[in-house]
A protein has these predicted regions:
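Structured-RNA-binding interfaces characteristic of tRNA pseudouridine synthases
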Residues: 1-259
Length: 259
């Protein structure tokens, strides 16, 4: 029986394109599975457990994801970080590790998250872009999408932006920032001449909420829905989303902020 005596907060970066999300699942490759397997190699035993601050969907990447390690032995954070990075796959990196006290709760204390959704339109992008962004063949009305993105700011009922919404769930969420701008976060010689990023920041999110918000704005940019449709969708009425679940490979968990 594991008796937790020591607690460590791990800050992670990963390219999610070849993984089935963060959380361990039977017979598929996940980030948590790879981390746990590497911890066994580094520590020489499996007398620990890990818990993520949040889940991520398959193919979603992270610039700043966090998890907590519960251990029954003291571990030097600097040694552990170096050892993990020597043994983890090249698409997973531990950026830092810090010891925390037993009252720290990695899920409850992670109060603010910032997501980025990258997209472009027009001529098909270079295949090397596939892990990083969503491509739309048709022209998008970017100014209209920018206007639509601002509607999400504030407290709203996001029932229509939750995958398989349960009627008993609280769908009220507060979005502190929602905006679309030209992408200057990630660039490369193979990137399109111009690409865009939807930046969404909030205290908590429903399942696939950000991807449904992105899909809704893409439909707005294609002229398939209106600004008024988005406004009405935030009262929680209706049975079906007005948008679609945008491809996961465009989504990045960019920041996780703790109390």
């Amino acid at each position: 029986m594991l008796e937790n005596k020591f607690y460590y907060l791990v800050h992670l970066q990963f390219l999610g394109f070849r993984y089935h999300g963060w959380q361990k699942q039977p017979q598929v490759k996940t980030i948590q599975h790879m981390l746990d397997r590497t911890l066994i190699t580094v520590l020489g035993h499996d007398n620990f457990k890990t818990l993520g601050a949040s889940r991520t969907d398959a193919m979603v990447s992270a610039n700043h994801h966090c998890c907590e390690i519960f251990a029954n032995e003291k571990i030097d954070p600097e040694y552990l970080q170096k050892s993990l990075n020597l043994n983890l796959p090249q698409d997973i990196k531990v950026s830092s590790i810090e010891e925390v006290d037993k009252d720290f709760k990695v899920i409850n204390n992670a109060k603010v998250k910032e997501y980025l959704y990258f997209f472009c339109y027009g001529e098909k992008f270079h295949p090397f872009c596939a892990p990083f962004m969503c491509h739309v063949h048709e022209e998008l009305d970017i100014p209209l999408m920018q206007k639509g993105a601002k509607i999400f700011e504030g407290q709203h009922n996001f029932k229509l932006y939750s995958h398989r919404a349960n009627e008993n769930k609280n769908f009220e969420r507060t979005i502190s920032q929602s905006q679309i701008e030209i992408n200057d976060y990630f660039t490369g010689s193979f990137f399109p001449k111009e690409s865009y990023v939807l930046k969404i920041k909030g205290e908590g999110f429903l399942r696939q909420q950000v991807r449904l918000m992105a899909g809704t704005l893409l439909k707005l940019g294609l002229g398939e829905i209106t600004i008024e449709d988005i406004t009405k969708s935030l009262d929680g009425e209706g049975d079906y989303p007005i948008g679609f679940i945008a491809p996961a490979s465009g989504l990045v968990l960019n920041k996780t902020e703790f109390l």
